[in-house]
Amino acid sequence: EITKTDTTLVLYGDTPSVTFKTLNAALRDFDKKNLDLSVISMIVKDLNNSYGRLLIKKGKLNKIIEKTEQTNEEKKIQLCNSGIMIIKTKHLFKKIKKIKNKNKKKEFYLTDLVEIFIKENYKVSNFNCKLGESMGVNDKEDLAKLEKQFQEEMRKKFLKKGVTLIDPSSVFFSKDTIIGKD
């Protein structure tokens, strides 16, 4: 049985780097603002990407425009959709039935829920996270980019802790790397 406080967290399998810390912060933000739907967003400076864009009007999230539906002007928007959503469960099952496949790909876009919720005066917002955490991995090139970013972050982390890395680019870490005294 669904209660008034139940929340659904939508996660895609192609975002392996999202952390518990980020998800927890997004869920706290969702509760604090008493939202009905929240989208985890990210700033992507490389405009040649396949992410949906978040259209903001008057400082508020207005809708998400999927890649195939974007105009040239919309492709310039750097605020992108990670694919992660937080939704009050009591609304989800009612509103999901309202999604139509009236788009170029004739697909049912879950992101259309944003516009549906807004039109029905529900509280909708977005929560920003780091690109590396929410970057989708759809092919070997994406995986290589994510690994490169991870290695750069780990090198910076250990350098800040005072670890000597004579040639940082030649050092590779795993997620569970522990380094003792230098």
Predicted regions and their residues:
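Conserved beta-loop-beta/alpha segment of the NTase-like Rossmann-fold superfamily
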Residues: 1-58, 82, 86-89, 94-99
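A short glycine-threonine-serine/GTX helix/turn-capping micro-motif
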Residues: 73-86, 100-104, 132
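A generic structural signal for well-ordered coil/turn residues at beta-strand boundaries
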Residues: 50, 60, 80-83, 130-131, ...
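Left-handed beta-helix
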Residues: 105-182
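A general structural signal for well-ordered alpha-helical segments in protein cores
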Residues: 23, 61, 89-92, 110-111, ...
